Amino acid sequence: MSTLKQLLEIVDLLDDPKVDGEQVREFFTNKGLSHMEINVERIEGEKASTDFISIMIQGVEGKYSGGTSRSLGIIGRLGGIGARPECIGLVSDADGAVVSLAAAYKIAEMMRRGDFVGGDVIVKTHICPNAPTRPYKPAPMMDSPVDIFTLLKREAEGQIDAILSVDATKANWVIKHNGFAITPTVKEGWILKVSPDLIDIYIRVTGQPPVVVPITMQDIIPYTTPVYHINSMMQPWIYTKAPVVGVAITTSMVVPGSATGATNIFHLEQATRFVVEVAKDFGRGKVKFYDEEEWGKIISTHGSLADLMRRGAPK
């Protein structure tokens, strides 16, 4: 299986100063993908606006149609796909939107051809080609066009049993790998062990040993606490009880989110294939994001950390 065609088309679609959510909707509508429902919502912020996109792909045994198969959420986390007029072209920070939309495109095409996923797949991201930046060297840092918690609430809502949160994770000295990496599972304020099932998928997709982002407690507390966060990849856990795993697009050298010319198709193709493989297996009950028995022991002995770790985030 390859997702290269889908990626190339999505990158071409998004690398446009005039692109918006309606153009993304029109792109998919013109493909005749009947298993896909798309909603677009314009969100206005103090600094800019963005088009929030929600895509529902109905599984053959999914909850949307009355079934019982588990639903997977795929979030494309980012500040913006572009930073115009400061920077011209698609920026590194666009990776989350690119991968999530390419995965939706691939899964919907699979369904049309007769390769059906069991559970529903809900894809959420947003489109802003002119997101604001903050001063930073060697290139301006991406900023969110609207309040981040407004986006996070929308990303995490719905009947979702697990979430993959895809984000460019290149402007740090912690995870130094060309390709993509996954995180330990985060659930209700706890950082749990890395899912063995997701490790297996990572290995079969890349043919390489698994690469794991060493997230810390600081990375999962709300952005209202003014301390270092590797990025916002893990923030969706704040508004859901579903387990969240980050899919980080990574590089061996620091690449700012506002850098142009940084869209590495080969890295993104592997990450997209990983996301699609997880979607296929999760809905069929072949993948677990966490061990339910171990989780029960953790909660019965130590209790929930959700309220403690969510402090400062708006409800």
Regions found by a protein language model. Give the residues of each.
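Soluble metallo-hydrolase cores and metallopeptidase-like ectodomains found primarily
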Residues: 6-84
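C-terminal domain-closing interface element
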Residues: 29, 138-187
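Solvent-exposed alpha-helices and their adjacent loops that cap or buttress functional pockets
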Residues: 46-48, 63-68, 91-93, 113-117, ...
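Alpha-helical metal-binding/catalytic segments enriched in His/Glu/Asp
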Residues: 74, 83-125
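Acidic, glycine-rich active-site loops and adjacent beta-strand->loop/helix elements
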Residues: 78-81, 125-132, 170
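Short acidic, glycine/serine/threonine-rich loops at helix termini
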Residues: 86, 132-139, 174-178, 259-260
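A structural-propensity feature for long, helix-poor, extended segments
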Residues: 118-151
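Active-site-adjacent substrate-binding region
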Residues: 169-313
